[in-house]
């Protein structure tokens, strides 16, 4: 199925029961509500989705009422707790609370998959960019030996070492986590 944007151009966005799927910037993207307050964004390189079972995401999606709409060239999805706006052209994904306050921006053109050879196994280096509020503090990423509690403006190469443990999970003082 195609969604026709308000400006009359067809976007390659397929609606699912609890979200959308589309291709943008050389990757396949799925945005699915797992509950009224949980949205899963799943990105894979290339134009076809990966059917690999996640070792991390074990929650089955709850039956969640989702409203679909448009905001210019963007597609909107809303539950009773969260609104998500997607730009299928740039790959940008914008998250808002139920009052319309912006929580997080998955930056336009912010995701990159760079192929590399990992000891004979084809793999990817992944770069992901987010825009935070000016004074927003974020915590997480595991046990890092940087002497910093806030991970704001830190550049980290996430890999496990003897005294450094990588856990790719971030929590914001605004109450969301990813």
Predicted regions and their residues:
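N-terminal accessory segment at the very beginning of proteins
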Residues: 2-178
């Amino acid at each position: 199925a195609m969604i026709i944007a308000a400006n009359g151009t067809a976007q390659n966005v397929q609606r699912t029961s609890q979200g959308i799927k589309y291709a943008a910037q050389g990757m396949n993207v799925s945005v699915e509500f797992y509950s009224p307050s949980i949205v899963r964004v799943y990105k894979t390189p290339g134009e076809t989705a990966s059917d690999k079972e996640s070792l991390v995401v074990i929650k089955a999606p709850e039956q969640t009422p989702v409203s679909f709409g448009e905001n210019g060239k963007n597609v909107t999805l809303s539950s009773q707790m969260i609104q998500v706006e997607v730009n299928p052209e740039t790959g940008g994904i914008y998250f808002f609370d139920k009052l319309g306050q912006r929580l997080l921006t998955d930056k336009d053109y912010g995701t990159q998959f760079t192929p590399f050879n990992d000891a004979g196994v084809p793999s990817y280096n992944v770069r992901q960019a987010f825009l935070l509020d000016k004074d927003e503090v974020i915590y997480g990423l595991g046990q890092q030996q940087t002497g910093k509690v806030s991970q704001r403006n830190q550049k980290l190469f996430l890999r496990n070492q003897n005294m450094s443990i990588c856990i790719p999970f971030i929590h914001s003082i605004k109450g969301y986590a990813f």
